[in-house]
């Protein structure tokens, strides 16, 4: 029967209805929406920072509200306006858009706990006896501060503070008192202890000398020494950040909203547990808002192993970049963007999950995540293998772009079943592909059978004669057809072999209900290629 044309109509004519988006049409490809959750610099924190006077700080507070409805963000500069420049959210947006300039991004502020901000001190002593350069390595940026002969420690510290504060995307500010340069995180709490800043003296001949926790000579009179932080490997991190924030209110504000990827700045078990519970809840059969979460860490392998195995969730990814000078929340945002769009912006060849849900993501080039400064901090092959075995996504040195990193293999934190190693859902593409199939089938079946009636399977195998009526066997045929299409697209494998497992049955208890079991075997990526090269005589 023609849609909208009553069977009782008497007026002669030809009446054709154009049906858009109905049965038989593709649901189309929707853009993947990414949500960043992290601290913003709002009015209270900005007011505190703006009380500092050596030098005077002038930070403009972000305009967003903590734990509110997420804000659409069209650019990194927009994120700076909404969340405050140099906030976690601003820096995460910079990392995301650097990899995926056209990505669809939302940001949501997790309320700053108004605790203690992490800090670090570099103290200069003795006037400069010759000109040199003070080099500052700050979150992937390199700031060179010229020092003239005769410059006092106060002059040197002042110039360094000005250089750091002028780079307003940095997550910390600088103050000086005589020759003591103090860096303080813009956001409070223990995540500030994951920040690092390195200093070097560059002589007129170009010789570089790193400033350490021992008095370090510039070779031109001035000395420098680091204090107030924590040494780890070849880096010196901020310290004393305290009072953990909570994402509980932020999670509650998106309790019914789907974002394909949620990137958290947090790395503590409490906040991660709430994120994981949210992902599991919304993926349930009555909600069907399937999502994945991504976080980052620059901690030790032992620490991230405890964290990943403690979560053990297929919808959660933990990106690990030990002793990274780029904050881990920025690393997580850029890994997320690379997973979605691939690495062409970094000169790579890999496509992302928006193009192919089963894309092989091994070796994704990250455009802005720099490698560790010291070789000793770069993970060994045994450490990379251990990370993968424990549900951790490790980053490693890029062979194509010296000084930058790649994603070794994109894995989920799900690595255990009943405390026994189990890698059935090791790759994030398994989750992405299964979600793609479920989302697409949901759309296809919903449009195909909208307003249909359900009849029992016919004994002769023929379809029902009445309009808008189907049977379990006909539904099964449609699902089987779609599974074959996914196989042709390179998303699934062995569809024919698995078809005996595809069951579609009318409920014997609830009239009008059909229950299905739909087997999906996701195509694996080519991960390892081994062989022997044998010498012949």
Over which residues does each language-model region extend?
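Loop-centered beta-sheet repeat module
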Residues: 307-392
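Structured, hydrophobic secondary-structure cores that serve as assembly/anchoring elements
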Residues: 1-104, 356-361, 365-537
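Polar low-complexity, Ser/Thr/Gly/Ala/Asp/Asn-rich disordered segments used for subunit assembly
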Residues: 1-345, 498-499
């Amino acid at each position: 029967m023609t849609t909208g044309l009553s069977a009782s109509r008497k007026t002669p004519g030809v009446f054709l209805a154009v049906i858009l988006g109905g049965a038989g049409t593709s649901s189309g490809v929707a853009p993947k929406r990414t949500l960043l959750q992290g601290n913003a610099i709002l009015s209270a924190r900005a007011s505190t920072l703006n009380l500092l006077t050596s030098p005077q700080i002038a930070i403009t507070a972000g305009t967003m509200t903590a734990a509110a409805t997420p804000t659409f963000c069209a650019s990194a500069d927009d994120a700076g306006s909404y969340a405050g420049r140099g906030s976690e959210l601003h820096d995460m947006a910079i990392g995301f858009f650097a990899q995926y300039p056209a990505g669809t991004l939302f940001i949501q502020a997790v309320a700053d706990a108004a605790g203690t901000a992490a800090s670090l001190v570099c103290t200069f002593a003795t006037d400069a006896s010759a000109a040199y350069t003070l080099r500052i390595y700050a979150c992937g940026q390199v700031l060179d501060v010229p020092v003239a002969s005769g410059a006092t420690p106060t002059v040197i510290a002042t110039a360094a503070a000005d250089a750091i504060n002028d780079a307003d995307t940095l997550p910390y500010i600088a103050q000086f008192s005589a020759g003591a340069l103090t860096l303080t995180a813009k956001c409070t709490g223990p995540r500030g202890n994951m920040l690092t800043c390195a200093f070097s003296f560059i002589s007129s001949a170009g010789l570089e000398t790193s400033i350490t926790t021992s008095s370090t000579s510039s070779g031109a009179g001035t000395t420098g020494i680091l204090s107030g932080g924590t040494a780890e490997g070849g880096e010196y991190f901020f310290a004393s950040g305290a009072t953990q924030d909570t994402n509980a209110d932020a999670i509650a504000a998106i309790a019914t909203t789907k974002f394909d990827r949620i990137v958290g700045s947090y790395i503590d078990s409490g906040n991660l547990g709430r994120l994981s519970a949210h992902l599991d809840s919304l993926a349930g059969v009555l909600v069907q808002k399937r999502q994945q979460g991504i976080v980052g860490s620059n901690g030790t392998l032992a620490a991230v192993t405890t964290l990943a195995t403690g979560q053990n969730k297929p919808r959660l990814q933990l990106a690990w970049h030990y002793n990274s000078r780029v904050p881990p929340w920025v690393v997580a945002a850029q890994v997320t963007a690379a997973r979605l769009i691939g690495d062409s912006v970094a000169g790579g060849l890999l496509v992302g999950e928006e193009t192919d849900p089963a894309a092989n993501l091994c070796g994704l080039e990250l455009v802005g995540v720099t490698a560790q400064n010291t070789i000793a901090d770069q993970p060994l092959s045994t450490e990379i293998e251990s990370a993968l075995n424990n549900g951790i996504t490790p980053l490693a040195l890029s062979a194509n772009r010296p000084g930058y990193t790649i994603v070794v293999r994109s894995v989920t934190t799900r690595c255990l079943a009943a405390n026994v190693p189990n890698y059935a859902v090791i790759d994030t593409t398994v989750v992405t592909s299964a979600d793609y199939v479920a989302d697409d089938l949901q759309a296809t079946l919903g449009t195909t059978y909208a307003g249909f009636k359900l009849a029992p399977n016919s004994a002769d195998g023929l379809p029902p004669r009445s309009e808008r009526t189907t049977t379990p066997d006909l539904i099964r045929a449609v699902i089987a057809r779609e599974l074959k299409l996914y196989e042709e697209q390179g998303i699934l494998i062995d569809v024919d072999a698995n078809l005996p497992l595809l069951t579609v049955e009318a409920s014997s208890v609830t009239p009008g209900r059909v229950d299905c079991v739909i087997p999906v075997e996701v195509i694996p990526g080519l991960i390892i290629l081994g062989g022997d090269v044998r010498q012949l005589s």
